[in-house]
């Protein structure tokens, strides 16, 4: 049983397959077609020091579908922090109010620090440009559900590969399976070499037009303005790539387009009505996956 979920590196292939199998068992409950109250009497503390819509609401939905309750602290409500309270003290206090904590924080390493100071399980919902393990698990779940497998997949990761914690987590997990990975990005947003060196997988840089007919999955990310050290660097790469329905004309019928959302202008709305779009389904899959994680750490 997991105590905390801080990094995707905390899990091996067997752990991942176990969570994905468990998530599938929760899908009917996630859709509201079946009732399950295994977390009745439990309270989840959502601590979001950065803005979030999908991740926070997904955890809240997952918890309530399982019969539990949620207390929320948003970035705007972090009053004690504004008054000078340390993160360690905040975690110690809040862990006395609930049975598990979900934390999102702008500083890389904050989630692991929180786990070291908490008396209850901690789940990382994103720490700066570091990790986002629950997003990775729902991404893997989406690929398995929509493509029917994880091994033997060819995937292209496109967009902001430098600052995206989603990509940094995902590529570590992809390397646990038999996948071919293409990296597509402006040079200024290339995946850091230390991350490439840290994974054992078939990885190469490419242009989308070179691989569009070959890939099974196109995973697109937005350029994250909030991660850039200065406005000028952001302006240089802003709008440097965009997927349209026309872009996908050469893709296999079975190829799927994924995106962790929110999108800005990197995926044109014309893609939404194509057979390739899976990003809204991907977002829903976050509920059963997070139900599986919550049940694992809280029971």
UniProtKB/Swiss-Prot annotation:
Carbamoyl phosphate binds at residues 54-55, 104, 132, 135, 261-262. It catalyses: carbamoyl phosphate + L-aspartate = N-carbamoyl-L-aspartate + phosphate + H(+). The lineage of its organism: Archaea, Methanobacteriati, Methanobacteriota, Archaeoglobi, Archaeoglobales. One of its GO terms (molecular function) is aspartate carbamoyltransferase activity. PROSITE patterns: CARBAMOYLTRANSFERASE. L-aspartate binds at residues 83, 165, 222. The keyword Ubl conjugation does not apply. The keyword rRNA-binding does not apply. Pathway: Pyrimidine metabolism; UMP biosynthesis via de novo pathway; (S)-dihydroorotate from bicarbonate: step 2/3. Its EC number is 2.1.3.2. This is Aspartate carbamoyltransferase catalytic subunit. Pfam families: OTCace, OTCace_N. Keywords: Pyrimidine biosynthesis, Transferase. It comes from Archaeoglobus fulgidus (strain ATCC 49558 / DSM 4304 / JCM 9628 / NBRC 100126 / VC-16). It is an enzyme of class 2 (transferase). Coiled coil: none annotated. Heterooligomer of catalytic and regulatory chains. GO terms for biological process: 'de novo' pyrimidine nucleobase biosynthetic process; 'de novo' UMP biosynthetic process; amino acid metabolic process. InterPro entries: Asp/Orn_carbamoyltranf_P-bd, Asp/Orn_carbamoylTrfase, Asp/Orn_carbamoylTrfase_sf, Asp_carbamoyltransf, Asp_carbamoyltransf_Asp/Orn-bd. Catalyzes the condensation of carbamoyl phosphate and aspartate to form carbamoyl aspartate and inorganic phosphate, the committed step in the de novo pyrimidine nucleotide biosynthesis pathway. Belongs to the aspartate/ornithine carbamoyltransferase superfamily. ATCase family.
